[in-house]
From Swiss-Prot:
Family: Belongs to the G-alpha family. G(q) subfamily.
Topology in membrane: Lipid-anchor
Protein name per the record: Guanine nucleotide-binding protein subunit alpha-11
Residues that bind GTP: 46-53, 180-183, 274-277, 331
Protein localization: Cell membrane; Cytoplasm
The organism of origin for this protein: Homo sapiens
GO terms for cellular component: cytoplasm; extracellular exosome; heterotrimeric G-protein complex; lysosomal membrane; photoreceptor outer segment; plasma membrane; synapse
Keywords, sorted A to Z: ADP-ribosylation, Cell membrane, Cytoplasm, Disease variant, GTP-binding, Host-virus interaction, Hydrolase, Lipoprotein, Magnesium, Membrane, Metal-binding, Nucleotide-binding, Palmitate, Transducer
Catalytic activity: GTP + H2O = GDP + phosphate + H(+)
Chain positions covered by the region annotation G1 motif: 41-54
InterPro entries with a match to the protein in the record: Gprotein_alpha_Q (IPR000654), Gprotein_alpha_su (IPR001019), GproteinA_insert (IPR011025), P-loop_NTPase (IPR027417)
Annotated region described as G3 motif, given as residue ranges: 201-210
Record lineage: Eukaryota, Metazoa, Chordata, Craniata, Vertebrata
Role summary: Guanine nucleotide-binding proteins (G proteins) function as transducers downstream of G protein-coupled receptors (GPCRs) in numerous signaling cascades. The alpha chain contains the guanine nucleotide binding site and alternates between an active, GTP-bound state and an inactive, GDP-bound state. Signaling by an activated GPCR promotes GDP release and GTP binding. The alpha subunit has a low GTPase activity that converts bound GTP to GDP, thereby terminating the signal. Both GDP release and GTP hydrolysis are modulated by numerous regulatory proteins.
């Protein structure tokens, strides 16, 4: 074989390979285009601690693989850390609010717990378990807990602190509810894709604290639906970042901004009025009218309170043609979220029938 014929042969092989690669790329591009058409992007928005991360966890439980024993074990130290964080917040608040411990020994217990570096906590040693239990039973700490709207305390504090014995047992494995209740502030952007009826739902959770919000801008392209979470129980609370600003007013301001963004002109808006269980407890002793004087409904009435809050948010919508879909939720209740998201999924699919060739 001559050198020329060998080169021609090699060249034709290269051309064939190049054509094959090009064909593969074209095929992949067509596939990507088709998949993009069958992908719904759901953007979870809301202020800090409104329940967005819990909602994502529920999607993993309801529509994903859930949490294996190994996954749950990964939450163990976070549960311990949440317990220390909650007790430290109350110990600091005892001083600020000038509440006294009823039992003298709790001054020493408070000192012991206060000295713990929460981020280094990986175990739950007996001396700390004993100190936390004794502190939680102190009438002074209970009074401090009752005044929690005056400082920052996680919604899960009572859930964990009343169950310290179970959590302190040897070989403790967090339950699904323990996992749902764990509070870890979201920094950055978390995406959770799941497949439903041959459609990919890509749920995007972004940090709700003010410092996190400037990162949102990158998520604003091709959003099918905005899912905006409001914590119903925050009507009497102040912001983590500013202790003279009402959390619900901040949530309203953010919602107004979001629904008037030009990016979201074609996105449907679904409003989740979350933490309805906490509202039902709180409304019995903390009156909505004290924080929102325009409320003229009955006191201690959760139904009247939540309908008023819903109307406040819906009234922020300047576009009379745009429907705000709304649901009252409890993000830690799997069955409630299963039911609500089934309705949300149907709404989203109905609104996107033509575009996604679902008719």
């Amino acid at each position: 074989m001559t050198l020329e014929s060998m080169m021609a042969c090699c060249l034709s092989d290269e051309v064939k390979e190049s054509k094959r690669i090009n064909a593969e790329i074209e095929k992949q591009l067509r596939r990507d285009k088709r998949d993009a058409r069958r992908e719904l992007k759901l953007l979870l928005l809301g202020t800090g601690e409104s329940g967005k991360s819990t909602f994502i966890k529920q999607m993993r439980i309801i529509h994903g693989a859930g949490y294996s024993e190994e996954d749950k074990r990964g939450f163990t130290k976070l549960v311990y850390q949440n317990i220390f964080t909650a007790m430290q917040a109350m110990i600091r608040a005892m001083e600020t609010l000038k509440i006294l411990y009823k039992y003298e020994q709790n001054k020493a217990n408070a000192l012991l717990i206060r000295e713990v570096d929460v981020e280094k906590v990986t175990t739950f040693e007996h001396q700390y378990v004993s100190a936390i239990k004794t502190l939680w039973e102190d009438p002074g700490i209970q009074e401090c807990y009752d005044r929690r709207r005056e400082y920052q305390l996680s919604d899960s504090a009572k859930y964990y602190l009343t169950d310290v014995d179970r959590i302190a047992t040897l070989g403790y494995l967090p339950t699904q509810q323990d996992v749902l209740r764990v509070r870890v502030p979201t920094t950055g952007i978390i995406e959770y894709p799941f497949d439903l009826e041959n459609i990919i739902f890509r749920m995007v959770d972004v940090g709700g604290q003010r410092s996190e919000r400037r990162k949102w801008i990158h998520c604003f392209e091709n959003v099918t639906s905005i899912m905006f979470l409001v914590a119903l129980s925050e009507y009497d609370q102040v912001l983590v970042e500013s202790d003279n600003e009402n959390r619900m007013e901040e949530s309203k301001a953010l919602f107004r901004t979001i629904i008037t963004y030009p990016w979201f002109q074609n996105s449907s808006v679904i409003l989740f009025l979350n933490k309805k269980d906490l509202l039902e407890d709180k409304i019995l002793y903390s009156h909505l009218v004290d924080y929102f004087p325009e409320f003229d409904g009955p006191q201690r009435d959760a139904q009247a309170a939540r309908e008023f809050i819903l109307k406040m948010f819906v009234d922020l919508n300047p576009d009379s043609d745009k429907i705000i879909y709304s649901h009252f939720t409890c993000a830690t209740d799997t069955e409630n979220i299963r039911f609500v998201f089934a309705a949300v999924k149907d709404t989203i699919l109905q609104l996107n029938l033509k575009e996604y060739n679902l008719v």
